[in-house]
């Protein structure tokens, strides 16, 4: 394979390529060697699969998504607690179930503002670095919403949902077997 531009900048970096799609059968194996998972997937089934796998494997998830002129970034680590001992939420605490197909347009159908991809991606990378280095204020327990047309950012406080089917008090999701692949 061709040399990576990243290796040219830092020859000490170890790059691992996975030439496969993430699926229920391989999700836990794919993320097992990593401390943090950065999800920038463009479809709901993958987002939910990655969230569920990260929860089951006790991995921190830094999520980012965009559509049209809006973006969202959040850090999920429901296996950890905040300063007062309350567990952090997972993705399903905010978005319980994937929406029915066709309820929301895809990025290909609706389009995305190219510059917003860079902005949201840079914020996601910053959150990953903050988590790895243990610096700054984590976005765990928050949803950062970026509205490009109004040049506005909002931080929305989110809490663990005791009724969450994954991390709640009586979870019904205990593995990835419900995913169709």
Regions found by a protein language model. Name each.
Residues 1-181:
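Adenine nucleotide-associated cytosolic modules
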């Amino acid at each position: 394979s061709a040399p990576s531009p990243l290796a040219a900048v830092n020859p000490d970096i170890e790059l691992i390529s996975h030439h496969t799609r993430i699926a229920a059968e391989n999700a836990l194996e794919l993320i097992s060697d990593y401390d943090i998972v950065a999800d920038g997937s463009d479809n709901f089934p993958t987002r939910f699969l990655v969230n569920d796998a990260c929860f089951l494997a006790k991995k921190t998830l830094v999520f980012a998504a965009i559509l049209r002129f809006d973006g969202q970034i959040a850090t999920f680590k429901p296996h950890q607690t905040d300063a007062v001992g309350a567990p952090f939420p997972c993705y399903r605490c905010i978005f319980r179930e994937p929406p029915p197909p066709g309820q929301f347009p895809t990025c290909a159908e609706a389009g995305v503002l190219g510059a917003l991809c860079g902005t949201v991606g840079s914020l996601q990378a910053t959150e990953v670095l903050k988590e790895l280095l243990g610096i700054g204020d984590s976005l765990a327990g928050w949803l950062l919403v970026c509205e490009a047309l109004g040049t506005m950012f909002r931080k929305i406080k989110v809490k663990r949902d005791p009724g969450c089917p994954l991390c709640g008090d009586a979870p019904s999701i205990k593995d990835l077997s419900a995913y169709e692949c």
